[in-house]
């Protein structure tokens, strides 16, 4: 054990000290006083300045800081050498400060006490090498590691389950092919070759405290010959809705398989936990290279899964253990959100589960919270909130402003922050505020009063434009009354219809008399017809027609 004292060391500085004056006595002084603590082993070591002085012994005392109760340090009383082991001292608390003092003795003469600086044993302790037990398979080595210290160790009593172990392994024939792995107290090293000698060494670590121990002695072991029944390989486990599917590869047919699992926390506890492996439901004596088991048979957490094969020749070794995290296999779908404007300065947001999520009942297995992000549609500045509720309100918003919202579901208290992808973005406009309503009313009233005025102005403008650019083709009535109807009427008559004087040659007087009478009658009729025509606005050419008739009759008389 003393060979390991070159690590963590507490230096106890001692000054020059002298035995009581006596004739011929030499001055003695201890030098380089050191304390080494490895696990529960305590060592005190120093150098003597004068080895020529005989019959000099050394003794040490200790006390808990502040108690003023010095006790003899067991194992370090009247020591003739320059080192002592005081591991037998029963310390009740390794986190309390301890004071040490040491002196030289020669017969009845003693030096004065020299005290060293107080120290805390736990802080000065070094992690020692673990004990290792090996067992060989054809392609693997089984490790059984005991934590540093004894079973009843007080130094690591609170840390026995916190140790992690680092293994360096190599083929005995070639130390250049080293490989380092981190293992649990009960673990396996895989991917080895049959019938090969492998050597390894192990050291323990407390990672949270950043403390690394020293390596164990080197252990060597031969792997066995190749097993007749090979082990299954490439273990995989997948989640599919409400079930888990366990798959593996196997090169031969006509084999049956068995699968087991172990809660991961057993791996951290030192000791043999082979009896803690449990049979996976629906995965015993299966003939296919997969098996299916329901989600509800497993509680939330991390498991290790292993498979082995059996046939007429025997049973294989267990396959390589596969870590299985139920949380990592859980599929969380994005939520469905709806947004509604409540007032001019708030929006109501409702978060619901998608149909896929409802079918998988994820929210029943794991409590969910929602990460909600919202922002103004015209801005990239986002605000993020976490909500356990599925209905909540965003207050203190701007009126008549468009806000956009998206959300995702997270597993509550999950260290890996596992969650779904974000939902579709939904945008909604807030309602108008009181000021906006007032301006809306004023604007509406102004528009109602302005419309008639605008219509009137436009109509007047159109009249002016029409009068200037599109005048009427008919002259005004004041001008038209100066024009008589007769000239206009005559202008419209054709040349053939103009009035002419007609001359007749009369040979028979009796006929003339008849004609005159007839003319008188016609004249009266003509006047009446003319008056009637003037009243009605129509004109008749009846006199001309009558004349023409008479002229037609005269030739008949002539012919007689």
From Swiss-Prot:
- Species annotation: Bos taurus (Bovine)
Region Important for interaction with TYK2: what ranges? 492-501
Q: Which residues form the signal peptide?
A: 1-24
Q: Which residues carry this modification: Phosphoserine?
A: 496, 536
- What keywords are annotated for this sequence in UniProt? Cell membrane, Disulfide bond, Endosome, Glycoprotein, Isopeptide bond, Lipoprotein, Lysosome, Membrane, Palmitate, Phosphoprotein, Receptor, Repeat, Signal, Transmembrane, Transmembrane helix, Ubl conjugation
Positions of post-translational Phosphotyrosine modification: 467, 482
A GO BP entry is: response to lipopolysaccharide
A Gene Ontology cellular component where this protein is annotated is: plasma membrane
The membrane topology of this protein is: Single-pass type I membrane protein
Protein name (database record): Interferon alpha/beta receptor 1
At the top level, the lineage of the source is Eukaryota
Question: Polar residues: which segments have biased composition?
Answer: 529-540
Q: What is its main location?
A: membrane
PROSITE patterns attached here?
FN3
Extracellular topological domain ranges are 25-437
């Amino acid at each position: 054990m003393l060979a390991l004292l070159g690590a963590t060391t507490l230096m106890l500085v001692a000054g020059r000290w002298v035995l009581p004056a006596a004739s011929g006595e030499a001055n003695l002084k201890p030098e380089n006083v050191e304390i080494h603590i490895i696990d529960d082993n305590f060592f005190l070591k120093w150098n003597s300045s004068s080895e020529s002085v005989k019959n000099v012994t050394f003794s040490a005392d200790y006390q808990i800081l502040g108690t003023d109760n010095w006790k003899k340090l067991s194992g370090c009383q009247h020591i003739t050498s320059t080192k002592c082991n005081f591991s037998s001292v029963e310390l009740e608390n390794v986190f309390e400060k301890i004071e040490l003092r040491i002196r030289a003795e020669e017969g009845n003469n003693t030096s004065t006490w020299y005290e060293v600086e107080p120290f805390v044993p736990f802080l000065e302790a070094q992690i020692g090498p673990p004990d290792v037990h090996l067992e060989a398979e054809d392609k693997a080595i089984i490790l059984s590691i005991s934590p540093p210290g004894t079973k009843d160790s007080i130094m690591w009593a609170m840390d026995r389950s916190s140790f992690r172990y680092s293994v360096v392994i190599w083929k005995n024939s070639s130390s250049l092919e080293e490989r380092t792995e981190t293992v649990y107290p009960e673990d396996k090293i895989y991917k080895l070759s049959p019938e090969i000698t492998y050597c390894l060494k192990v050291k323990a670590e407390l990672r949270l405290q950043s403390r690394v121990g020293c390596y164990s002695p080197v252990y060597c072991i031969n792997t066995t010959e190749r097993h007749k029944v090979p082990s299954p390989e490439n273990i995989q486990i997948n989640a599919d809705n409400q079930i888990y599917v366990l798959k593996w590869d196997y090169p031969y047919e006509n084999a049956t398989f068995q699968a087991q699992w172990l809660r991961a926390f057993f791996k951290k506890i030192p000791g043999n936990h082979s009896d803690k492996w449990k049979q996976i439901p629906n995965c015993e004596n299966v003939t296919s290279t997969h098996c299916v088991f329901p989600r509800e048979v497993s509680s939330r957490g991390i498991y290790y899964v292993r498979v082995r094969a059996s046939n007429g020749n025997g049973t294989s070794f267990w396959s390589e253990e596969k870590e299985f995290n139920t949380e990592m296999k859980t599929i969380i779908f994005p939520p469905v959100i709806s947004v509604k404007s409540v007032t001019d300065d708030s929006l109501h947001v409702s978060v619901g589960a998608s149909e896929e999520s409802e079918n998988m009942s994820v929210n029943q297995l794991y409590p969910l919270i929602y990460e909600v992000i919202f922002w103004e549609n015209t801005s990239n500045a986002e605000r993020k909130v976490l909500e356990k509720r599925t209905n909540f309100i965003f207050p203190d918003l701007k009126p008549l402003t468009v806000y956009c919202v998206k959300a995702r579901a997270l597993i509550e208290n999950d260290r890996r922050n596992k969650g779904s992808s974000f939902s579709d973005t939904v945008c909604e406009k807030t309602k108008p505020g009181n000021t906006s309503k007032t301006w809306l009313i004023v604007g509406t009233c102004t528009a109602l009063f302005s419309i008639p005025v605008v219509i009137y102005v436009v109509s007047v403008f159109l009249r002016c434009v029409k009068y200037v650019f599109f005048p009427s083709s008919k002259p005004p009535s004041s001008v038209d009354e100066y024009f008589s109807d007769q000239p206009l009427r005559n202008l419209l008559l054709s040349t053939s219809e103009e009035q002419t004087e007609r001359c007749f040659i009369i040979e028979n007087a009796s006929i003339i008399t008849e004609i005159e009478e007839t003319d008188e009658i016609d004249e009266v009729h003509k006047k009446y017809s003319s008056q009637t025509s003037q009243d009605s606005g129509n004109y008749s050419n009846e006199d001309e027609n009558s004349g023409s008739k008479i002229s037609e009759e005269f030739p008949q008389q002539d012919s007689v």
